[in-house]
């Protein structure tokens, strides 16, 4: 999507009043600003600013001690460029919104290489220079948990009302019990052009895996993965759950992983 296409996209969706302008940090967490749609041009023209340091925070969103991007520069801003990924609807918030994906550049126009998306783009350029095309897909595992508990515990089934208490790998019952949640995940993936494929229940109670299809663009595959994680968490909250992609939320149950399938075509 170009900056010229974005206003037409919003005009077709008059219910949208807010845009989440976001950048992916080094931990795969989306960070950014809530911006009124009147500032769309600022987002798509590369005029929006955010601190360069936001890309190197820890997983809790705090500055790393002695981070030169904070103290040595006075926490200087960088400029945020529109990546060109189409604006996408966010329907799990209290009001409909849109999502815009950005990446950072320096004041002089150079890509900011502390941005993981910029770093990946540089690697992809090296493959292209060799006449090679990476083809990439991801598989993401996550748990649905009960957010009301002080410590993670499996959720109650929306069908039976009983808490899940056993592991159920490839359980059709577990898929069907969480059918409303999974249906909305797939709808959101379609709306955000994320190529969601098969879903299975995994080895842990309330654990699922959803595969994303192969694409011949590592940047697109990485974008798909981080946006997928965000929408799963958002839709889980809408349904009264919490979702976690944490590697080991339970000490006595199977952990969650992310599998990356990677091929090179010449």
Where are these regions (language model features)?
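ATP/Mg2+-dependent ligation/transfer catalytic cores
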Residues: 1-198, 220
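Short, solvent-exposed loop/turn segments at the edges of secondary structure
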Residues: 95-97, 137, 203-205, 255-259
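A short glycine-rich, hydrophobically flanked beta-strand micro-motif that places a catalytic Asp/Glu
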Residues: 138-141, 198-201, 242-250
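A short, mixed-charge helix-start or loop-turn motif at secondary-structure junctions
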Residues: 167-168, 213-215
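A short mid-domain helix/strand-loop element embedded in enzyme catalytic domains
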Residues: 196-211
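Acidic, glycine-rich loop-and-beta core segments that form the ion-binding/anion-interacting portion
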Residues: 207, 212, 218-266
